[in-house]
Amino acid sequence: PLTPEQKTAYVQMKELALVYLDNGEMATTASILTQLMRLQQITCGFIKPDDAPIQPIKNNRLPQLMECIAEISGKALIWATYTHDIEAICEALAEEYGADSVAAYHGKTEQDDRQDIVVKFQDTASPLRFFVGHPKTGGYGITLTAANTVIYYNNSYDLESRLQSEDRAHRIGQEKSVTYIDLVSPDTIDEKILEALRGKINLAQTVLGEDFRAWLL
């Protein structure tokens, strides 16, 4: 659930989005997806104002992830849409399980490091247990079948990105069952995004105008 700080920020952002919608200031898909992103960032525990530093908000998402991790065995893929989240997750996992246990894989990861991370993750003898990646970067074309758990810290509204990232652990060579876990804040945009993805709906093409209002209310 959201913390009181998150609830306050979420309600304020939602009301602002409704005002924009009523004033006709969200006539494009891009503007609506931007508001979706801002609401989702709050559920993840931060606010990123335009041209301003990230403002962390007290949240339960990271503790919830650590509780999930404590209950699983083996290697895990953790997908997160925002670099800020990837860095926070890696820091928490490194503190709990050791720096060698975790690797970040996102747009700023050096090309030379990317293959090395994949090789180490796939090596059952390697201490690298947690692959924390952005689905747009790590979700395409690489094999990560060493994982038996896939956790979505948050979800992109891009259906193709979700499907591709799911497949990283479920490719040829996977000999065990894979558990998929979604971290979701109840009664927020998180639930709407996950519901759409499970229904194989690409939000980037469908959420406009009154559809978006229905999501907010």
Short names for language-model regions:
Residues 1, 82, 117-118, 152-156, ...:
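Bulky hydrophobic/aromatic packing residues
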Residues 1-142, 209-217:
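Conserved Helicase C-terminal RecA-like lobe
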Residues 76-78, 89-92, 121, 149-151, ...:
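A generic "structured core" feature
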Residues 106-110, 154-159:
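Short, acidic/turn-prone active-site loops that include or flank metal/cofactor-
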Residues 142-155, 178-182:
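A short beta-strand element within the Helicase C-terminal
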Residues 157-217:
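A conserved SF2-helicase RecA2
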